[in-house]
From Swiss-Prot:
UniProt superkingdom: Bacteria
Protein name in UniProt: 33 kDa chaperonin
Post-translational modification: Under oxidizing conditions two disulfide bonds are formed involving the reactive cysteines. Under reducing conditions zinc is bound to the reactive cysteines and the protein is inactive.
GO cellular component: cytoplasm
């Protein structure tokens, strides 16, 4: 069986005799697309991968249409790490760096004084925001505690980030006791112990069915149809134009003069360039029409 068939997929599964549910996700091309236009240090790349997997696993627990933003803000050299995902498993991520970053830096050294913020935004209904202390060695451990505290359910979160066959990969598993109260703590602990034995080459390189069999071959596991995951930025010429109009006219004229009559707006997330000349900006102001581009 070709392991690549389960790249960029999210699977849900149920341990039928244990009243415990699970999720498994692996990001391959999605992770590559996210990193594509950036040259992040390895430690930042790995942190973004960890946060992306966590966001995918979080969005899979939503019982409504909407999106989740997982964000770290601090006063260290990594000022911001942000991941946004929705119920369609479309995801994007970015980081902002201000200072020197070494690959041997701990999470605390990267972030300094900071917090982890989770914002859940349903398409209908009120937004919810949770603020989590970054008081553990990894984001995964901080988020695992968040899951357990917010849902009052035993939860295991396991995330690995690295390389497989020379390409970046991020993968993770979530285990959670069912909310109906029918599961026992002993059953959960037994499955969590099995889950913790997973090797990098297994979580990175096996198809879902084979991975689950390897870990839980004595269990009855019902595996549901997967959901595809993809990188999706959502930027557009129109959005860039709207942002440009927030700048005052004198400053726009100055930028146009400095850059040979064309302003280059680059998306911070995906790196796409949007170009605006004087004519395009005037049209934006007067009519709200989509701007004319110059390349």
């Amino acid at each position: 069986m070709n392991y690549m068939q389960d790249n960029d997929k999210l699977y849900r599964y149920l341990f039928q005799d244990r009243a415990v549910r699970g999720e498994w996700v692996r990001l391959n091309q999605t992770f590559i697309d996210t990193l594509n236009t950036h040259h992040y240090p390895n430690v930042v790349r790995n942190l973004l991968g960890e946060m992306m997997v966590a966001t995918n696993l979080l969005t899979a627990t939503l019982k409504f249409n909407g999106d989740i933003t997982v964000q770290i803000q601090g006063d260290g050299p990594l000022r911001l790490a942000l991941v946004n995902g929705n119920h369609r498993q479309q995801i994007r991520a970015l980081a902002r760096i201000d200072g020197e970053i070494r690959d041997d830096m701990s999470l605390h050294q990267l972030i300094g004084k900071g917090v982890l913020v989770i914002t859940i935004a349903p398409q209908e209904g009120e937004r919810y925001q949770g603020i989590i202390a970054l008081d553990k060695p990894t984001v995964t451990e901080c988020l695992e505690e968040y899951f357990q505290r917010s849902e009052q359910l035993q939860t295991q979160l396991l995330i690995r980030v690295g390389e497989y066959e020379g390409k970046p990969v991020a993968a993770g598993m979530l285990l959670q006791i069912m909310p109906d109260g029918s599961g026992s703590p002993d059953d959960f602990d037994h499955l969590a112990t099995l889950t913790a034995t997973v090797k990098d080459e297994e979580i990175f390189g096996l198809p879902a069915e084979e991975l689950l069999y390897r870990l839980y071959h004595e269990e009855t596991v019902e595996l549901y149809e997967p959901q595809a995951i993809q990188f999706h930025c959502g930027c557009s010429q129109e959005r860039s134009g709207s942002a440009l109009l927030l700048i005052n006219d004198d400053e726009i004229d100055e930028i146009l003069e400095e850059h040979n009559g064309s302003i280059d707006m680059q998306c911070e997330c995906c790196g796409t360039h949007y170009f605006f000349n004087k004519e395009a900006i005037e049209k934006l102001k007067k009519s709200g029409e989509e701007p004319v581009t110059t390349h």
